[in-house]
Amino acid sequence: MADAGARRPFFRRRKTCPFTGANAPKIDYKDSKLLMRYVSERGKIVPSRITAVSAKKQRELARAVKRARFLGLLPYVIR
């Protein structure tokens, strides 16, 4: 039998992409409320390893954030 002090390693469950699935929201540059969830408090786009967004959807998200910034819907920098 194993040591009494030995424990099973903790396995973190892999998060799934919030933009894939049946009722997933569409990435739209006009939806600033949705986009703000993926922008940090300083105004930077949060990386996919933190938000668990797939690579394809992360590219779409970055494109939507940049387009919203250009049109004045999102700020470039939050102070």
Curated annotation (Swiss-Prot):
UniProt xrefs under Pfam families: Ribosomal_S18
Molecular function terms, GO-annotated: small ribosomal subunit rRNA binding; structural constituent of ribosome
Job description of the protein: Binds as a heterodimer with protein bS6 to the central domain of the 16S rRNA, where it helps stabilize the platform of the 30S subunit.
Subunit annotation: Part of the 30S ribosomal subunit. Forms a tight heterodimer with protein bS6.
Alphabetic keyword roster: Ribonucleoprotein, Ribosomal protein, RNA-binding, rRNA-binding
Protein name: Small ribosomal subunit protein bS18
Family indicated by similarity: Belongs to the bacterial ribosomal protein bS18 family.
